[in-house]
């Protein structure tokens, strides 16, 4: 599952509103703000609250991806059938981040309304909490090796409850993810247009690069490809998208080497810039590796297919493209802090 860039909308709103609000803010601080100026400041504050709430939902979305991965690894060990399979190796870490629950609760109590996202978040909250409770109980059970004394009796009981909870969790989080992805797509299109119009060429090129990267992942989704079937996909579609990524990559590299423009837009963290460039290059390479494996029909090996970790770290798999992209998102967010 891909991640959404948390800081894109935040930068867009504050910068675009701030242009008209800087003088008004000065007047307000002097105690001389007119009614119109006060209205502008109130609008900026309202937009800021909206962005903060949206970014909390982005964090929730990203954390759901981590939860999904842990659930998959549990089922790889214990099975997803009614009868639990005895876990022979170390039990997979099942920790569910408390901040996910806290962010949902904070957003649901917010005065800012986002009807579609709020409804989906409210529906999924009890199942996230249930999965968290069960995951912690199972982790404690396996770490304490209680299965030695009860011959997996408690393991079976928790596994049965976990299967039911995950079913509801998957149904409700799916609705939330779809709502987030729809909103994120709209936000990115709007932001790219505004960045270009305002002459913010660093932000424009970064946002466009991220959009093209996401288009590549969207095609993986559209073709329903994973480690088990990706060599059967339409490779020509990916070549077209790879060419667009490569062309924009050259423009992004140029703008990130433009010290004057970087300084003008507030990009002064050279370490963050270098880290983003490295991950951006790695992502471009991961798309090339996927295309190469598709063209040479190098199918997924049994170890890659049976274990999600190996699928993610093996070059040229859809799962690897996703993993590297998620790391690009992390560096993109760090760059825009």
Give the label of every model feature segment.
Residues 69-150:
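Post-signal peptide N-terminal segment of secreted/secretory-pathway proteins
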Residues 13-16:
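C-terminal motif of bacterial Sec signal peptides marking the signal peptidase cleavage site
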Residues 239-337:
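A cross-kingdom marker for long, charged
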Residues 159-280:
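Extended amphipathic alpha-helical interaction segments
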Residues 117, 122-195:
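Acidic/His-rich structured neighborhood in mature extracellular/periplasmic domains
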Residues 25-87, 156, 160, 167, ...:
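Immediate post-signal-peptide N-terminus of mature secreted/exported proteins
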Residues 2-8:
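Sec-dependent signal peptide recognition
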Residues 18-20:
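Bacterial signal peptide processing site
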